[in-house]
Design a protein with these regions (language model features):
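Central antiparallel beta-sheet cores of small beta-barrel/beta-sandwich binding domains
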Residues: 53-138
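Amphipathic/hydrophobic helical signal segments and adjacent flexible N-terminal regions
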Residues: 1-47, 51-62, 184
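Glycine-rich, aromatic-bearing surface loops/beta-hairpins
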Residues: 153-184
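Surface-exposed interaction patches
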Residues: 120, 128-130, 146-150, 158-160
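Edge/loop elements at the starts and ends of beta-strands within beta-rich repeat scaffolds
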Residues: 43-48, 77-78, 154
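Short structured motifs
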Residues: 34-38, 68-69, 114-118, 146-148
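Amphipathic hydrophobic-ligand
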Residues: 63-69, 142-147, 171-175
Length: 184
């Protein structure tokens, strides 16, 4: 009888995980924005100086942290080098340098010191989607978090970023960022 309940439990767990992944799949695709404007090309938008303001929310929507950021990008040899410096409201300072290679009109590959493997980017119309796993320090431990990042260009100066953060396929938070390109 114990074996029967064990197998039923396994079947229920597998069914739950399957249904969760089915209903949580992202049905929005970069190609959906093919004919939208203004067109975002990250190698142009992030070239030069950009300011950012953002907030981090937990899985329930509670704002847990906020930041301001200074960014500076250079585009050379088909690669955007984007230096980011974050100033968190709890006093933490953080730096990241992205190297994002433009593969073709729509596809990008990115790397950074705290990114696991390579980030995949897709640009269509006014939207840029970036998928990557980031090592995030949380309570003294380094945790791998998956980011599903969307940037939507609003005009020549403003872009809005919305990211879903996941661990083991489960949503653990959201990140909202407003970018302002500084005329250089």
């Amino acid at each position: 009888m114990k074996i029967f309940f064990f197998f039923i439990s396994i079947i229920l767990i597998i069914s739950f995980l399957f249904l969760k992944s089915y209903f949580n799949r992202n049905i929005m695709k970069p190609e959906d924005f093919q004919n939208t404007s203004p067109t975002i090309k990250i190698e142009k938008y992030f070239e030069g100086q950009v300011k950012a303001w953002g907030l981090l929310q937990d899985r329930k929507g509670k704002v847990t942290r906020q930041f301001k950021a200074d960014m500076f990008g250079r585009f050379e040899n088909n690669t955007l080098t984007l230096e980011e410096e974050f100033f968190w409201n709890d006093g933490e300072k953080q730096k990241r340098v992205w190297n994002i290679e433009k593969i073709d009109e729509h596809n990008y590959i990115g790397t950074a010191a705290d990114v696991v493997g390579k980030a995949k980017g897709f640009s269509y119309g006014s939207a840029f989607k970036f998928e990557y796993d980031l090592i995030v320090p949380i309570k003294g431990k380094n945790i791998k978090i998956s980011f599903d990042d969307w940037i939507f260009k609003q005009d020549e100066e403003i872009a809005i970023n919305r990211a879903t953060l996941k661990k083991f396929g489960f949503k653990v938070g959201e990140l909202t960022v407003f970018f302002k390109k500084i005329n250089n």
